[in-house]
């Protein structure tokens, strides 16, 4: 988003296509949740967003897809994989429905996740020094139970 700043739908609806730095973040469609619950969760998160021009690619879409892919690969219990699949689809839908992303943003996020997964698994993990580092790191952060 530093190379190609892209405004989300809520920004275009509010300010048009003028590039204005210093515009505060906006909760957009997620404000309805805050209004219904009285919690102010999304106002607290998005209201302080320092960079409103980070819509492309949608990292919300990418992160959830990566979690889902690794749940599939790890042979997690079916209910966990199903839950992550539903959450992933829900985030993709919600990102567009609440005016935080366009469909193209979500699509590019999905492509980034797939590209990252393929690069990591089929290029980097085949390079021995990198694979050894990852194995040592995994052992360090998740020691085996005895």
Predicted regions and their residues:
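Small-polar-interrupted transmembrane alpha-helices in polytopic inner-membrane proteins
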Residues: 1, 80-97
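Membrane-interfacial catalytic/cofactor-binding modules of polytopic membrane enzymes
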Residues: 2-74
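Interfacial helix-loop-helix junctions of multi-pass membrane proteins
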Residues: 5-13, 55, 90-116
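Perimembrane helix-loop junctions in membrane proteins
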Residues: 5-12, 74, 102, 124-132
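Active/binding-pocket-proximal capping segment
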Residues: 16-18, 86-90, 109-114, 126-133
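Hydrophobic transmembrane alpha-helices
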Residues: 68-73, 113-121
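Membrane-interface helix-loop-helix junctions at transmembrane boundaries of multi-pass membrane enzymes
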Residues: 72-82
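Membrane-proximal cytoplasmic C-terminal regulatory module of class A 7TM GPCRs
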Residues: 119-146
